[in-house]
């Protein structure tokens, strides 16, 4: 039987992970956070001291890169780098910022493409990211594109960071959101855009509902 896929795309802080996680739980599907996968690569780049703007340096790290994804009894996706649980480490603000640079490299996207598609071949999934409906799973049965005002997305990101015990200022977070939006929209490979057959949802006011 063919597996069912639901693709959820959108910029940082639009509410992708919240919607994807709840949808997967209700349907009994697997939730795949592709952003966590790219952050894991970014963490490897940072730990190796490689220059993220130097494709050759980053590509040299991909050969033999050991990334694994698993799920605990609570259903939370956990990421492993060379056998080490890096689920919390990849959520640091510095790693998130680096992930956007790393994700713009064609070699990285090609390297991770089959890894992501394999999850959807093996089980029913709800997958979120920037290019799920356009590149990773272009034939997904349901496609949703979430968006929200940058200021609202920055507020959500700030709250998330503080809940993790990380100090941050609103202006710095907003600046990072806007910078990442620009990087995601203008990158040469798999830029952030709404799939033609995706349903558009603006979540700006949902926090206040």
Q: What role is predicted for each listed range?
A:
Residues 19:
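Hydrophobic positions on the alpha1 helix immediately C-terminal to the Walker A/P-loop
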